[in-house]
Amino acid sequence: MSNCELTVLKPAEVKLSPRDREGIINPMYDCQPAGAQYAGIGIKDCIPLVHGGQGCTMFVRLLFAQHFKENFDVASTSLHEESAVFGGAKRVEEGVLVLARRYPNLRVIPIITTCSTEVIGDDIEGTINVCNRALATEFPERKIHLAPVHTPSLKGSHVTGYAECVKSVFKTISDAHGKGQPSGKLNVFPGWVNPGDVVLLKRYFKEMGVDANIYMDTEDFDSPMLPNKSIETHGRTTVEDIADSANALGTLALARYEGATTGDLLQKTFQVPNHLVNTPYGIKNTDDMLRKIAEVTGKEIPESLVKERGIALDALADLAHMFFANKKVAIFGHPDLVLGLAQFCLEV
C-alpha cells in the first residue's frame, strides 16, 4: 500500500430555488359554447343560436371582435329566471323563427346549449322537431338546417366545444343529403387555426393540384378593406361543401382534438377514409402532411414545395443555434398547437 490517504467525498448538495411565481398565471381557458360559436361562424349563411344567458354570447363575440377586428353574427335566446325555472324551449322556438324572418338567406342554425339549459334539462332535439314543423309551415320553400350542439361549460373547454359543433353540423347536413356520386375531392379539417393558416393550406393544395374542401374556411376573417365589404364577416364553407363531404376521396384531419371526430363520423357513416396527421408546424409535421396528401390523392409533391423546404432547412441550419442553443421552452395552448410546436422545438 502506498501512503495515499482515503478521501471521503461529501454527498452532492442540491439547492432548490424558491418559486416566486407559477408557470401559468390566469390562463386563457374558455368554455365549450365559445368553441362552438367559433365553428358556427366559419359557415356561410349560418348564425349560431346560443341557448343561455346573454353573457354566454356577448363576451364570446367580444373575444372574436378583439382578435379578428371584425363583426360576427351570433344570436342568443336571452334566458332569464322564468325560463330557468319553467324551461326555455319556447325561447328557442321564438329565436329560430325570428332569425328565419330577419335573414332570408339563412341556411344553418347550430343551437348551442350552455350550463343553465343543460342543468334544467331542456329537450333540444324535441324542440328542433317543433321548430322544423314551424319552419315548414311558414317557409315551405326554404330549408334551414337546425343542429343540436350540447356544450355545457361544466365539462370540456372551447376546444371540445369546437369539435362538438363541427361534428353535429356535419351529421345534420350530411344525413339530410345522403351520399351521392364520388367527387374526387379531399376533406380537410385544419382545426382551430387563424385565417393566414387557411390561406397557406390552400396554396399547398393548389401547388399539388389537389381539389380540397377546407372545413371551416375562415379566410375572410382577415378580409381586405374593399368598397363592397360586408358589415358582418362570415366563413366560406357552404352547405353544399358540407353535404359533399360524404362523397369525398378521403378526409385529412390536421388536428387530433379539433376535427378528427368528424372524420371518424364520415368514415363510419359514408365510408370516407379518415387520415390523421399532426398540425403542420415545423419541417417534420409539414413533411408528414404533404406525404399523406400525395399518398391519398396520387399527386406528386411539386418541386416548388421541395425548394421551400430547403430554404427553411437552410435558415434553421444558419440561424437556429444562435437563438435556441441551451434554451428552455415552455409551451401552453391548444393541444394540437402544443403537439406541433413541441415537434418544431425538437427539430431546432
Swiss-Prot record:
[8Fe-7S] cluster binds at C31, C56, C115, S153. It catalyses: N2 + 8 reduced [2Fe-2S]-[ferredoxin] + 16 ATP + 16 H2O = H2 + 8 oxidized [2Fe-2S]-[ferredoxin] + 2 NH4(+) + 16 ADP + 16 phosphate + 6 H(+). Keywords: ATP-binding, Iron, Iron-sulfur, Metal-binding, Nitrogen fixation, Nucleotide-binding, Oxidoreductase. Its cofactor is [8Fe-7S] cluster. It is an enzyme of class 1 (oxidoreductase). SUPFAM superfamilies: Helical backbone' metal receptor (SSF53807). GO terms for molecular function: ATP binding; iron-sulfur cluster binding; metal ion binding; nitrogenase activity. Its EC number is 1.18.6.1. Pfam families: Oxidored_nitro. One of its GO terms (biological process) is nitrogen fixation. InterPro entries: ChlB/BchB/BchZ, Nase/OxRdtase_comp1, Nase_comp1_CS. Binds 1 [8Fe-7S] cluster per heterodimer. Belongs to the NifD/NifK/NifE/NifN family. This vanadium-iron protein is part of the nitrogenase complex that catalyzes the key enzymatic reactions in nitrogen fixation. Hexamer of two alpha, two beta, and two delta chains. This is Nitrogenase vanadium-iron protein beta chain. It comes from Azotobacter salinestris.
